[in-house]
Structure formats: C-alpha cells, structure tokens
C-alpha cells in the first residue's frame, strides 16, 4: 500500500549530536533523490554525497535508499545522515518539504505505515 504522500522527519533526538538522521518514506522519494543529489545510487548502499540546492552544496551527507517493498515501511524510503545541530537538519528538511507531496510525519507514522504494509507482526 502507498498512501500517496511522502512523509519526512528527523529520526534522531533533537540536540547537539554530531550526526542527525532524516528519514523520508513514500512515492516522492525518488523525486527527493533527483532534486538534491547529482547521482543515482543503488539500493541498500551507503553513499557519500553532496546535498545540493541547485549548484549550492548545503551539506555533505551519507544517504541510503531502500526500494519498496524491502524497507521498514514497505514503501520507497531514504535515510539521510547529515551533520548534527538543528541548523543543518532544519535546513535540509525545509528543502525536502518544497517538493509537492512531501510533508512532515506525524509521531509514529513510520511505524503505522510499516504495520499497514504488513511489515510488522
């Protein structure tokens, strides 16, 4: 099942950690990849990339793409590990949310999608 929208959320605690994890799940995941990364990457592999807005590099990140149905949610999913601190992850999330069909996830929504897509027992 695909709900028709793509959810985005910070998946690590807010604070001063060195690394923050942004998680995206849904039908616009490939659009996120095409918009912000200059190269395609394989499924289930960590990729060192530049998160770009046009020609401007916003951060150096590690990104992993999980192809549906072999992801936590059962949908296409992207995990972006960026530099920690609220300024960086807020900026990247704000840019991702400019893509039509992307929105902030509700609390527990990744798990809800996992359950709905029969990924949990």
Where are these regions (language model features)?
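A glycine-rich (often HGG/GG-containing) alpha/beta subdomain
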Residues: 1-121
């Amino acid at each position: 099942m695909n709900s028709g929208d793509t959810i985005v959320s910070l998946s690590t605690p807010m604070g001063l950690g060195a690394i923050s994890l942004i998680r995206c799940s849904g039908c616009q995941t490939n659009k996120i990849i095409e918009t912000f990364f200059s190269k395609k990457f394989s499924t289930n592999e960590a990729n060192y990339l530049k998160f770009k807005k046009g020609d401007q590099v916003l951060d150096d990140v590690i990104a992993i793409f999980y192809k549906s149905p072999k992801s936590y949610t059962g949908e296409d999913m992207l995990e972006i590990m960026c530099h920690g601190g609220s300024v960086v992850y807020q900026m990247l999330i704000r840019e991702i949310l400019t893509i039509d069909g992307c929105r902030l996830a509700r609390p527990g929504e990744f798990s809800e999608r996992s359950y709905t897509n029969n990924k949990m027992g």
